Amino acid sequence: ALADSGQNMKDGIDLAVEEINAAGGISGRPIQIVYGDTQGANATGMTEMERLITQDKVMAVMGAYQSGVTEVVSQVAENYQVPMITANATSDSLTSHGYEYFFRLAPTNMMFIRDMEQYLLDLSAKDPADDIDVKSVAVCADNTELGQQTATWAKYFAEENGLEFKGEVLYSQGAADLTSEVLQLKSLNPDALIVDNYVSDAI
């Protein structure tokens, strides 16, 4: 379910490395990329991180895509004092451990939800005569730490902004059928839906 997203990121990295190396690399030295595949699993991610550091002798690590996997592999990188940077994972807790070798580029989940709800408010206020008038929200997300954070922050900022929080529908990641969840969301009948899904689940 996550393979397509992983391949898209790999394609982008390969293109960037090709362009950087064609321009002389970094301080005259070419970049060499070694890939590890977490397969979306914490244990596999930890094994791959160990391999990259102890066998491939990488100087730094980028990743991972999922917040849960990033949480555990960042511990491995920290133990080996190897710099790690994530551009994707958004869980609030990732930078709460005081690690010296872990860095994030992506905003936290709290920031995303705060800005989503502010956008909905701005959209509603932009043209009072428009059909968009958001007074209530609900959440659809997978039942992980990240999804639970999404629901918590959505409710918090809804109350802060005077919006009615209609509820949350959390599902098992990678579920083959989300019909019942869709029906639950329909019954909640929010003016806007805040979703935090991986691509295959969102489709």
Show which residues each predicted segment covers.
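Glycine-rich phosphate-binding loop signature in dinucleotide/nucleotide-binding domains
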Residues: 52-57, 131-132, 185-190
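Residues that mark the start of a beta-strand
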Residues: 32, 135-136, 192
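Beta-alpha junction/loop-to-helix N-cap segments that form part of ligand/metal-binding clefts
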Residues: 4-12, 19, 23-99, 105, ...
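Extracellular/periplasmic bilobed ligand-binding domains
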Residues: 151-203
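Residue-level signal for short, function-critical loop segments
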Residues: 1, 39, 141-144
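Conserved hydrophobic residues forming the short capping helix/wall of the S-adenosyl-L-methionine
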Residues: 17-24, 124, 158
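Surface-exposed acidic, glycine-flexible loop patches that form ligand/cofactor-binding
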Residues: 23-26, 126-132, 187
